[in-house]
Amino acid sequence: MAMVTADASAAADAATKQPDVEKDYSSYNGASTAGAGGGGVVESVVARWRREDMLDKCPLALHAAAAAFAFVALVLVASNQHGDWMQFDRYQEYMYLLAIAALAFAYSLAQALRHAHRMRGGADPIPAPSARLFDFIADQVVAYLLMSALSAAIPITNRMRTAVINNFTDATAAAISMAFLAFVALALSATVSGYKLSRQMYM
């Protein structure tokens, strides 16, 4: 009889301790879940910082690329003089392309220098509230002018190349390609500026 009573007491003690064990285990799982959630928040913040840093560096890289492409196009057109009909200044289309390439080069170089100065800690010459709006509008205007110059130069170049292919037409085609790449860089820069401007308006 004593043994039965002892067994019953042991079983009662075990039943009484069981919830404590489960409670401790549940607390452990909760702490682990909270820790995992905190890690996710940190990763999200770090990813956002990286995205912001990339968006901040994009204008510098894109304007530098546009300046380089526009400069090459400018040099190719300006040096494309081979005598007789193979003189770029005999064609209004190429004169227009030369002028717009020079404008795109000057604008893109100025913007690249401005963004480089700002990223080094210097003051932006354009006030912060209107800087993104200026970038967005100016990039679109210069990109449109480049596309206009390309639309004027491509047809006459195609007509020339159907008749003859020589150094003059090759240099002109190369200049058009470089001007198109400058257009792409400025179009991408305008897209980034538009995205940053939209975020500024809704913040």
Curated annotation (Swiss-Prot):
Compartment(s) of residence: Cell membrane
Gene Ontology cellular-component terms listed: plasma membrane
Mode of membrane association: Multi-pass membrane protein
Residues exposed to the Extracellular side: 79-92, 157-171
Pfam families assigned: CASP_dom
Membrane spanning stretches: 58-78, 93-113, 136-156, 172-192
Cytoplasmic side: 1-57, 114-135, 193-203
Record keywords: Cell membrane, Glycoprotein, Membrane, Transmembrane, Transmembrane helix
Residues bearing glycans: 167
Subunit and interaction comment: Homodimer and heterodimers.
Family in the record: Belongs to the Casparian strip membrane proteins (CASP) family.
Protein name (record): CASP-like protein 4B2
